[in-house]
Amino acid sequence: MLRFAPSPTGDMHIGNLRAAIFNYIVAKQQHKPFLIRIEDTDKERNIEGKDREILEILKLMGISWDKLVYQSHNIDYHREMAEKLLKENKAFYCYASAEFLEREKEKAKNEKRPFRYLDEWATLEKDKNHAPVVRLKAPNHAVSFNDAIKKEVKFEPDELDSFVLLRQDKSPTYNFACACDDLLYEISLIIRGEDHVSNTPKQILIQQALGLNDPIVYAHLPIILDETSGKKMSKRDEASSVKWLLNQGFLPVAIGNYLITIGNKVPKEVFSLDEAIEWFSLENLSSSPAHFNLKYLKHLNHEHLKLLDDEKLLELTLIKDKNLLGLLRLFIEECGTLLELKEKISLFLEPKDIVKTYENEDFKERCLALFNALKSMDFQAYKDFESFKKEAMRLSQLKGKDFFKPLRILLTGNSHGVELPLIFPYIQSHHQEVLRLKA
């Protein structure tokens, strides 16, 4: 079984979605069940409704799952596993207070050495502290694993101490809950971000202590770097939020296409998730960081907009008139996102706001003069744009840029765009909607 294990503590990050996509693809390729595990044990950081938001995004991306679990439902199991380790002398109670440990950390900082927990501290405050934590005994050997992307990763004994499994309130730590659940659901491969590399040896040690016979295979994805700063994309970067990208009008299929492409060798530029299942391989992923490129994402989104069938295009743009399909196709040629496309069609059909956009009084006068001329014309009487244009120029007494710029704004709501002769048939059939001014 493979899994994707998000925390409902904020917007879904593109790095998390990338991991979800890859786990889903490999599960499909290997004909294994796919589990979604909501890691909600950190009650203080959980945000109401974020779990549902994550699941909705996965559905939009075309990702389905065979099983959905909430980690908090397994707390009794986590405590049971901790008790097992205590009985087998693989874990121990630690009575050292948070204040004591903080002093030791400060001492290590002042002495410019890494802080490392010492097992001898476990009973120092036993008489004063009646709510101990449970720690796993530190290993006396190195922990290594062969990462499917990063190759061999090794942690020496002095890099690992006796770490906490259960907190004072008996709640499991992230690493303990994660390791227990991966064992419980027989997870065979974990694809996740490289920010989890330091968690992996701890989870391996927990699973070894609990008697895992078949080691889990790990694949840690390189981080995604911001295109301008070159630094890791954090949750503060709006483009790192999948929700933000969707709200900006990026299609789910295009986002998926992009996240599969970056740092990867792909056989074609534009593809769907189902197509990627046919050829995706972890071996083709680079071990170097990937750079986020919003311009290229827009390009891919533009290509996917062109691939939308008529029914889906009308649905996404909220247009009910099928006669406007041809116009939508023309507008797509100039749009990188669905939001841009919806704005273009809205400007075309809505009353034109010449005052708000163009405050120059001379320009306003020319617009009004041309508007009055156009209102007197029978749009259906002209066989083509050329004959329509000549009559409009004659009636308005305008020419050159004094004519063409106001004309484009009055007919499309935009000062530039698709050639007017191409969209003239749609102007003719919808002139009563098109030729309106905002009050």
UniProtKB/Swiss-Prot annotation:
Protein known as: Glutamate--tRNA ligase 2
Gene of this entry: gltX2
Motif 'KMSKS' region positions after renumbering to this chain: 232-236
Chief site of localization: cytoplasm
PROSITE patterns for the chain: AA_TRNA_LIGASE_I
GO molecular-function term, one example from the UniProt record: glutamate-tRNA ligase activity
Family annotation (Pfam families): Anticodon_2, tRNA-synt_1c
PANTHER family given in the database record: GLUTAMATE--TRNA LIGASE, GLUTAMATE--TRNA LIGASE, MITOCHONDRIAL-RELATED
Organism of origin: Helicobacter pylori (strain P12)
Family membership: Belongs to the class-I aminoacyl-tRNA synthetase family. Glutamate--tRNA ligase type 1 subfamily.
Catalytic activity: tRNA(Glu) + L-glutamate + ATP = L-glutamyl-tRNA(Glu) + AMP + diphosphate
UniProt key word Cell membrane: no
Documented EC number(s): 6.1.1.17
Subunit details: Monomer.
Keyword Cytoplasm: yes
Intervals of motif 'HIGH' region: 6-16
Domain of life the protein comes from: Bacteria
UniProtKB keywords: Aminoacyl-tRNA synthetase, ATP-binding, Cytoplasm, Ligase, Nucleotide-binding, Protein biosynthesis
Binding, ATP: 235
Function, as annotated: Catalyzes the attachment of glutamate to tRNA(Glu) in a two-step reaction: glutamate is first activated by ATP to form Glu-AMP and then transferred to the acceptor end of tRNA(Glu).
